[in-house]
C-alpha cells in the first residue's frame, strides 16, 4: 500500500494506529481515509481539474479476515466523529426541549384554528378571519432542528434520504462488517436498483 502518498499527518496517524493494533497497513489507511472523508465531505470538494470538481466522499471496501482488527481500526478513526455527534446532541438537549414545546404550542394553535373554521362552516358563518389567522400562523411554524448525525450502520434508503435532507446533509455508512451493510435495508433487492 502506498502509505507514503498520504499527507504527513494522515500517514503518521495511520502508522501509529497500525503499530499499536498490529493491523495491515491497507486496512488502517482505509479506515483513516474513510473517516477523514466523512468529516470533510460536507465542507470541501476535491478539484481534479480546472472545471472538474466533486465531493470528497469515498466508497471504500476493504476485504479482511475475521480478527484482522477492522472494528478496532475504524473505532480509532471514527471516535472523534462519534464524540462530536454526542457532544452536539448533549449541547442541544435544552434547545430540543424548547423546540418541542414551541412546536406543540404551534400545532395546538393550528388545530384550534382548523376546528374554528370547521365549526364556523357548519354554522354557515364567515371563516375569513380564521383562514387569515391560519395563513399567518403558517409563517411562524418553528423550524426543525438540525442535529449532526454523520454515522449510519443499518438504515433504510428512505430513512437515510430523509435524514440527509431534513436532519443533517452529510453522512456515511461505516461498518467493519460487510454483512451489516450488504445485508441492510439499503441493499435490499428493491433498493439497490
Walk through the language-model features, giving the residues of each.
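Phosphate-handling catalytic cores of nucleic-acid transaction enzymes
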Residues: 1-193
